[in-house]
Amino acid sequence: MDHSPWQRCLSVLQEELPAQQFSMWIRPLQCVINDNVMTLYAPNRFVLDWVRDKYVNRINELLTINESNNPLLLRFDVGSKPTIDNSVTNSPVSRNTGGNESLFAKATSAPKVAEPESNIPKKTNVRLNYTFENFVEGKSNQLARAAASQVADNPGTAYNPLFIYGGTGLGKTHLLHAVGNGILLNKPNAKIAYMHSERFVQDMVRALQNNAMEKFKQYYRSVDALLIDDIQFFAGKERTQEEFFHTFNALLEGNQQVILTSDRYPKEINGVDDRLKSRFGWGLTLAIEPPELETRVAILKRKAQESQINLADEVAFFIAKRLRSNVRELEGALNRVIANANFTGRAITIDFVREALRDLLALQDKLVTIDNIQRTVAEYYKIKIADLLSKRRNRSVARPRQIAMALSKELTNHSLPEIGDAFGGRDHTTVLHACRKVKSLREETHDIKEDYSNLIRTLSS
């Protein structure tokens, strides 16, 4: 059977879709064509449902256009393609190889080597208590969690490298350890190295001092998965970047998994060599955003349950509405509430929480105000605050105004009418429309999603 129908679809979709969307949703699909039925196999139910929801119409259109003389029936399934003659894999050319075709080539397994001295991690230092099961999933981290899960199931083949970025305390480190635990669950003898980027720097410095660079290289290039947190700390360390560049290449050539995290998008990391930043984007790059209200409530309820505390819904919502910046802050606040309750023997009510977190809540209220949001958005988009309050409707002003309204709804306790009044006396329906519009744009447009995340980080810092 001719496999060109799916290859033609892939070529068009790769041109039409942003690289991140193509890598996340289309590239993992495997195709089998039998008796005019094209079956696309997704690696899991999450990917299958997403492709059906977002891309099935376009795929059918392409099949109709390209195969008008030989119509194909499209169906989906979860799993791997059968190993039969008429199967076909996705093999579009990577946009970012830069002519280095060998980067993704199959390589023979690296020979086992002696590990360096005790300053180098041993078999693994993955934290067993950070798993996918206790990672609270929401819209803000759904894609990153799904990609990390796929990597754990298929290390070295699904999204390599995986680059996860976002503000402090949003769950990036949790996902790194969850991947490590997932890999070890399937392959107990796998060699997993997790570390903060500064540990890599320290290991290299010690290796240089002890004339042990060869041992250092052997260890880091023999791991099955290298998980490095806060890669932005490589900035300005040219010797470290040079060594990591070669380590990175060696791992990918050997189909060994690399996962990196950062507090910002790869191209925004100053002080890191451009060729490294380019390689960071070779696989899949995903953001973790501050958790939305429902996820914050779920995190609080889960944490309370782990502490054998029955946290009432109204109390969880009260805390979640007042503390919005990150998971770490939420958990720290809850620990403080629980400790106060244990010391005093009092029940955890809204009044008790208000008392226990008095200084924290007061600080939060001072930090995020509509005035502060307007000033921050105006500076970010290089417009005047007066423009946000004006009746001007051109996009260069209207879009920042909508974003500022959406941020005001998310980050303050003001009502829609109050927000509208603060933006030049607008009606509450205008604010509601702005919030819905920005939500839609964040799902569809990478630039808007980036802008919104950057603004939240600025306002929450």
UniProtKB/Swiss-Prot annotation:
Any GO molecular function: DNA replication origin binding
Record has Thylakoid as a keyword: no
Compartment(s): Cytoplasm
SUPFAM superfamilies hit by this protein: P-loop containing nucleoside triphosphate hydrolases (SSF52540), TrpR-like (SSF48295)
GO cellular component, one term: plasma membrane
Start and end residues of each stretch annotated as Domain II: 83-124
Record bears the keyword Cytoplasm: yes
PROSITE patterns: DNAA (PS01008)
SMART domains per the UniProt record, alphabetical: AAA, Bac_DnaA_C
Pfam families: Bac_DnaA, Bac_DnaA_C, DnaA_N, Hda_lid
Region feature Domain IV, binds dsDNA, mapped onto this chain: 342-461
Listed CDD domains: AAA, Bac_DnaA_C
Region annotation (Domain III, AAA+ region) ranges: 125-341
Binding-site residues for ATP, renumbered to this chain: G169, G171, K172, T173
Record GO biological process: DNA replication initiation; regulation of DNA replication
Location of region: Domain I, interacts with DnaA modulators: 1-83
Keyword terms: ATP-binding, Cytoplasm, DNA replication, DNA-binding, Lipid-binding, Nucleotide-binding
Family membership: Belongs to the DnaA family.
Function: Plays an essential role in the initiation and regulation of chromosomal replication. ATP-DnaA binds to the origin of replication (oriC) to initiate formation of the DNA replication initiation complex once per cell cycle. Binds the DnaA box (a 9 base pair repeat at the origin) and separates the double-stranded (ds)DNA. Forms a right-handed helical filament on oriC DNA; dsDNA binds to the exterior of the filament while single-stranded (ss)DNA is stabiized in the filament's interior.
Subunit structure of this chain's protein: Oligomerizes as a right-handed, spiral filament on DNA at oriC.
Swiss-Prot/TrEMBL domain comment: Domain I is involved in oligomerization and binding regulators, domain II is flexibile and of varying length in different bacteria, domain III forms the AAA+ region, while domain IV binds dsDNA.
Name of the featured protein: Chromosomal replication initiator protein DnaA
Organism: Colwellia psychrerythraea (strain 34H / ATCC BAA-681)
Lineage: Bacteria, Pseudomonadati, Pseudomonadota, Gammaproteobacteria, Alteromonadales
